[in-house]
Regions:
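Non-heme Fe(II)-dependent double-stranded beta-helix
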Residues: 1-28, 35-128, 134-137, 174
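Short, conserved beta-strand element in jelly-roll/cupin
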Residues: 136-154
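Active-site region of the double-stranded beta-helix
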Residues: 106-107, 132, 149-158, 166
Length: 195
């Protein structure tokens, strides 16, 4: 049985070559924006599959006004790859694994979890935070692939990074909250890291 359309399966198994300059940029800044990792056709396909999963698995029933800052930031659903074979093919794809491995300069990668984050209209900002707070791992060889499933102009609040902020330890002990926004924003101003 074929899980994915042939063109999408082929794309997920093809390499996405990185230049030495891209790897160097990532090593220096601990983030990079890579364009056209996935085709529009592939993104549309997975948008449908992931949206169906989130609609099925989402347990948030409170109104926005009843939620704290973290709860307003986004709807989140974890480990969709365990629930849906199409999502599993994306999450465990050779293409994404190769990019992660090349950027971190490792021989291979393992997945900790996948996560779908859906911003709701009027939900507010996602406070500055450090993902390490949520990952009980001792290694700094960790990476996130943020894959927007639609065009995300500045007005929609796309993901923002602060170059070099991986060198800051302030905030690693803070959950996503109003406090993480204040403390990390304060540290970013002091260090003058671009973001």
């Amino acid at each position: 049985m074929t899980i994915l359309p042939d063109t999408i399966a082929l794309e997920l198994n093809q390499p996405y070559p990185l230049t030495p300059e891209q790897v160097d940029f990532y090593q220096r800044n601990r983030y990079i924006k890579l364009k056209h990792v996935l085709s529009t056709n592939t993104l549309d396909y997975f948008n449908d599959a992931i949206t169906r999963c989130v609609n099925t698995l989402n347990t948030e029933t409170r109104e926005l006004t009843e939620r704290d800052t973290y709860g307003k930031a986004f709807i989140q659903t974890f480990n969709l790859w365990l629930q849906n074979p199409q999502v599993k093919a994306l999450v465990l794809s050779k293409r994404l694994a190769q990019i992660a491995s090349d950027l971190m300069q490792t021989q291979g990668v393992r997945i900790y979890h996948d996560q779908a984050l859906f911003k709701e209209s009027g939900g507010g900002i996602t406070p500055w935070h450090d993902d390490q707070y949520y990952w009980p791992l001792q290694s700094d060889k960790t990476i996130t692939a943020w894959i927007p499933l639609q065009a995300t102009p500045l007005e929609m609040g796309p993901l923002e990074f602060s170059a070099g902020s991986h060198q800051i330890v302030t905030g690693r002990d803070l959950e996503i909250s109003d406090n993480s926004e204040i403390e990390i924003q304060k540290q970013l101003r002091v260090t003058n890291f671009p973001h």
